[in-house]
Amino acid sequence: MKPLRAPGRLLGTGLAGALLLGLCACAEAAGSASADHEPKDGSMATAPPAPAAPGLVTAVATVLQENDGPPELCLGGVAESFPPQCGGPEITGWDWNAVEADSAQGTIWGEYTVEGTWDGETFRLTEATSAPTDPTAPSDDPRLDPDNAGAVGRDLSESETQELQDEVFTDLGGLGGWSENGYVWVTVVYDDGSIQSYADDRYGADRVAVQSALRDVE
């Protein structure tokens, strides 16, 4: 274990551009957003799916354990405090003796590239290595192409876009979210395409762009 040191930056998660969002400011606004974004067929949408991954998945993320609690895989933001604060799904098979880590005040943590399986609730580790020095890579998502802009920018005002963003973030259990290129973006733990389909049905096509924090190992 490395000697105690204070983190000098926000511990990254390897997810470019994701900004933490609070819950919707008030129930009235959330209710209004729901009324404006009914499912396409007019029926009440079911709860969003929580798919399991069919094979191995990977991510660059902070792993953190507080006192006697289980190790957690922090796929969202990490608070720049000392010790840092974050939360996420439980990670099983983790061995702090097998990796370098920092510790303070009953908390132990580090940033790693992890690989394992995801059953929809728990991440089961198969391999962990040190995080890359610069984990950020340019995204090749076609929805970022200006020629492929989404419908939000032309259909909704700025306040309506923010309202939709808040609702989507809460509805999908987002880890991070923002608006860009005519889409409301939201990062979830894992999506096999079913969460994107749910979002399209509930909010309309070309409005919500779902990104998966856990990526399938190719």
Regions found by a protein language model. Name each.
Residues K2-G22, C26-E218:
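OB-fold and OB-like single-stranded nucleic-acid-recognition modules
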